[in-house]
Amino acid sequence: MPSVRSIAWALGGIAAATGLARLAREIFAVDEQPLATAGHVESAGATEATKTFAAAGSTPDQVGIPFAVTRAAAVEPHAEGREFYPRLLEDIAAASSSVHSLMFGWKPGTVGAAVSKVLLDRLADGVEVRVLVDSFGSRPYGSSKQMYTELADGGADIVVNDLLPPDRRGRYPDGVARWPMSTIGRSDHRKLYVIDGHTMWTGGAGIEDHFENGEFHDVMVRLQGDVVRQAQSAFLTSFAAQGGPLSDDLDAYFPEPADGGAIECRIGQVVPGGHISATHAARELIDGASDRLDIMNPYLTDADVISRIAAAAGRGVRVRVVVSERSNNFRASAALKHHYRRLLDAGVEIWEYPGAVVHAKVIIADDRVQFGTLNLDA
């Protein structure tokens, strides 16, 4: 009878097995009508899309820009914070024009202090630093306020994705907080860095100590090539939609890469307001797998996704699912274990990662891979 197994190898083993021959679903991926943007399709597309978005005074609900397939020249997966944080800090320290960070969770601590210090150093040398953080994940009005105040005092432009309207700190005279449900709870879970317009980082990790000290197991990926222009557009449109200032010369943010690359990839967005094309892309990957399907995700609870995983195993695909032996979310863990018998009976291999909390979000389907910040929850 099939059973749940314990696993003791790192994500790097899975990533290396793909060879990253085709990065067909980079970060999130999209559906809808794709915009011909950076790279071999239309080199000026990302710049023009950003200008159009900014000129229209678009809102956060409109930042789900669909991008076309483009190319990457270099794709470097890094597992564990002790590996990816030093490399990320090197890239930031080498920045000569701009550092842009879109971050769900950025809190004080050893890692937070290290990132803040290098950003303050860059600011002192005249490098532009722009930051978009989530109010729930980063606590900029609470425990993290001093850190963000220091960055702002150093010259950083910081805007916040608020889960509540601007009147969050007070109530109206009649004592009723008029917070429409349509504007509450729209957390921005993305994690993205764009450095000098030619290097980007994305993945599941925030700027928090538990990613560095071994408590959480995660992966970040460094990319260069044409795809970075799409990432830059994603950041700038989100930053502007939240009220961040944009310069008149946006062209400077989209330099022509020395090597556009040959690895097919595409950026999509999962943004507050209902743009969930990443989930659609994940389903397409699962449904399209013909030989192997490897999934590592911390909160695998979506019933539809689970049905698709079971169906893949049923049609002869070797399916391996890696989850936490010890999750940081007992409700999500209980919900997944409720489906264990169904998955096992379908032929799915379930591997429980011991010790650290699995926080990486990776799907490998044959020779295609999706990575980034997408949780496969309901």
Q: Could you tell me what each predicted segment is?
A:
Residues 1-3:
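N-terminal Lys/Arg-rich, disordered targeting/topogenic segments
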Residues 5-378:
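Charged, low-complexity intrinsically disordered terminal segments
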